[in-house]
């Protein structure tokens, strides 16, 4: 049952990604959301993109799906006519790295945690230009547009290659898929993700960032530190409830039948429904 449940989650995610890649991207509009100082967020289809513009040029965090590359370039040009110099990947999923090949072919330097390159390179369909050319294990810094931009790997969380991106001068943090604002997150257990690691990473970020920082989520609206705290509290409480029921000998079917408290209902209206979230926690616990 454990293997079947994990397979089902993985298969569902792959299927959803495939459908997304086949959709009509001509109808997608790229929206520019001002964040702070020279930092913006681009919303379109896929993971939110962080943007730094300035005298050094343009740096982006993630690049959504490949068919959106031209629209992303147009949005970037509206912000700054300079050259795109860097692409920072928060992890390897296609809705965050799909534009890599396009931007890499135009001489943007792609940087990511070591496991991101390994996972992208393991895909026979990956182009050389799509692969990160600079990788790191724990941390790296890019000094660009007058500030230090930190890439920090806290260990397994959403995947085994997550990076939290901190724009130190602008007081902005891009969480990648370590933050789904207002929704249950997808945790890729097959790619080294871990519910305990996910919670640990969010807690560590909250300990370090200023209370007035702006927080760019992987999915959802631009957030605040309070939003991230609320998200973390949800993670801790729902995981605790499932762990308690597992310890009491309840099955996955029992857990799904019981559900979660009503206050978490709205979290299950996104990609990950309540049953899927319970199953994710359950499978993560079984994998320990």
Identify the residue ranges that each predicted region occupies.
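Divalent metal-coordination and catalytic microenvironments
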Residues: 38, 52, 62, 76, ...
């Amino acid at each position: 049952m454990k293997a079947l449940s994990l397979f089902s989650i993985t298969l569902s995610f792959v299927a959803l990604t495939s459908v997304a890649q086949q959709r009509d991207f001509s109808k997608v509009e790229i929206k520019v959301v001002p964040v702070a100082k020279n930092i913006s967020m681009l919303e379109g289809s896929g993971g939110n993109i962080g943007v730094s513009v300035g005298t050094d040029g343009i740096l982006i965090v993630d690049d959504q799906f490949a068919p959106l590359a031209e629209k992303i370039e147009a949005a970037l040009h509206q912000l700054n006519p300079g050259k795109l110099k860097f692409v920072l990947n928060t992890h390897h999923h296609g809705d965050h790295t799909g534009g890599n090949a396009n931007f890499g072919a135009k001489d943007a330097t792609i940087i990511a945690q070591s496991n991101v390159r390994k996972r992208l390179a393991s895909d026979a369909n990956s182009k050389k230009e799509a692969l990160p050319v600079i990788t790191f294990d724990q941390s790296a810094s890019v000094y660009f547009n007058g500030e230090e931009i930190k890439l920090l790997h806290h260990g397994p969380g959403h995947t085994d290659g997550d990076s939290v991106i901190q724009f130190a001068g602008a007081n902005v943090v891009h969480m990648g898929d370590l933050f789904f604002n207002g929704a249950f997150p997808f945790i890729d257990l097959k790619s080294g993700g871990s519910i305990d690691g996910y919670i640990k990473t969010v807690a560590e970020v909250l300990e370090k960032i200023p209370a007035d920082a702006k927080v760019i989520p992987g999915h959802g609206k631009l957030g605040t530190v309070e939003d991230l705290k609320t998200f973390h509290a949800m993670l801790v409480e729902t995981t605790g409830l499932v762990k308690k029921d597992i310890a009491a000998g309840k099955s996955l079917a029992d857990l799904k039948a019981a559900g979660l408290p009503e206050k978490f209902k709205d979290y299950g209206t996104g990609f990950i429904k309540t049953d899927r979230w319970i199953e994710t926690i359950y499978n993560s616990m079984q994998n320990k």
